Design a protein with these regions (language model features):
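Short N-terminal strand-loop motif that marks the start
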Residues: 1-58, 118-128
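Residue-level recognition of short, solvent-exposed, well-ordered loop/turn junctions
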Residues: 22, 77-80, 164, 254, ...
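Glycine-rich beta-strand-centered segment in the early N-terminal region that forms part
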Residues: 19-34, 47-94, 98-112
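Mid-domain Rossmann-like dinucleotide-binding core that forms the NAD(H)/NADP(H) cofactor-binding site
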Residues: 138-219
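C-terminal substrate-binding/catalytic core of Rossmann-like NAD(P)-dependent dehydrogenases/reductases
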Residues: 226, 267-317, 325-326
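NAD(P)H dinucleotide-binding glycine-rich loop of Rossmann-like/cofactor-binding domains
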Residues: 89-168, 172
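Glycine-rich cofactor phosphate-binding loops and adjacent beta1-alpha1 units
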Residues: 161-165, 209-283
Length: 343
């Protein structure tokens, strides 16, 4: 079974054929999936850039157990827990792939072997996401494994954003991404981490994650706050993906600092340079850097083993996959930080 969006605004569970693996692939039986509040909601609404073919199979945050491997596979073994499994091609079943990770069985590709044999190219049907289809250590349980799909994307962006230990940052938005920047930033060794959100309850969650200060958008826009901040932030991070958010923090970034956008923006964002220092670096991170995302898992697994990072800090809702409509309704109502569904 798999979760299908038959047309924008609709969602259903449909029976499809179990994927047939090739020599470079492993078959994974899904244990748990997680909703990506932004991407999955946009795909359901028909508003994800570049995706306009329906029906499509939904989902890209997946964890499960390897149950079969192709003859050329070296980096997956039966019994391993794997993350990032997808279905890239549904063949003649009349379904397009919106990554297809919300499926009972998914496929992972042995990217390293594909690369060695010169097959890791788009012309050979290789997606960039194959690089981050990996196993996780045995101590990483299903909830941590599936939430790692979010964590590793965020931690993988630290290098792109020029974030180094000790830096002072302010993050706008306290959804799963914004809170991941806070939690992982503290574990990574960033200095002061402040957060901005409209809702006091979300600011309190951010403080529990390690944020030093929480502010509303109105508070950071006052002349008094801007004067007191005195352009002292090494980096400002937009964890929402809106130009109005970037403009709200441009007065806070230091000369030569980093303005970091994590999210998909509209076609023509407008930045008010009158609010910015003469020199700053703008980083647009609308797609993961796969090599950094993959490397981040080693650090995450260590933090999980040490008990310093737990999925329970992020998961607010748990459902069975048959309750997928209820899960998305909760997301739409704004109740969900992170939601997981079991198969």
């Amino acid at each position: 079974k798999t979760v299908i969006v038959p047309a924008p605004g609709k969602i259903e569970i449909r029976q499809v054929e179990t994927p047939v693996i090739n020599a470079y692939q492993a078959l994974v039986k899904t244990e748990m999936v997680a909703l990506c509040n932004a991407t999955d909601s946009k795909l359901i609404a028909g508003k994800f850039p570049g995706v306009d073919t329906y029906p499509l199979a939904l989902g890209h945050e997946n964890a499960g157990i390897v149950v079969a491997v192709g003859e050329k596979v070296r980096n997956f073994k039966v019994g391993n827990r794997a993350i990032g499994g997808l279905i890239s091609d549904f063949g003649a079943q009349g379904v397009d792939s919106g990554w297809g990770g919300f499926s009972e069985y998914v496929v992972v590709n042995d990217f390293e072997v594909l690369k060695e044999e010169g097959l890791a190219t788009p012309e050979q049907g290789c997606w960039d996401s194959f690089e981050i289809q990996n196993t996780v250590p045995s101590h990483v349980q299903p909830e941590e494994a599936v939430i790692s799909c979010t964590w590793r994307e965020v931690l993988g962006a630290f290098k792109d954003f020029n974030l180094t230990p000790g830096k002072k940052v302010i993050v706008v938005g306290s959804g799963p991404v914004g809170l991941s920047f806070v939690k992982l930033g503290k574990l990574f060794g960033l200095g002061q981490i402040d957060i901005v959100d409209m809702l006091p309850a979300k600011l309190e969650v951010a403080r529990r994650m390690g944020a030093d200060n929480g502010y509303t958008p109105a508070e950071i826009s006052t002349p008094e706050f801007i004067a007191a901040a005195n352009r002292s932030y090494d980096a400002v991070i937009d964890a929402v993906g809106l130009d109005v958010v970037v403009n709200s923090v441009l007065p806070l970034v230091k000369m030569g600092g980093d303005v970091c956008v994590y999210g998909v923006m509209t076609k023509n964002p407008t930045f008010d340079l009158s609010k910015a220092p003469y020199n700053f670096d703008l980083h647009m991170h609308q797609w993961p850097t796969r090599s950094e995302e993959k490397a981040a898992m080693t650090t995450l697994a260590q933090w999980i083993e040490e008990g310093r990072l737990s999925a329970s800090d992020f998961i607010t809702h748990r459902f069975a996959i048959e309750e997928i409509e209820e899960a998305f309704a909760a997301v739409k109502r704004g109740e969900v930080l992170k939601c997981v569904l079991t198969f």
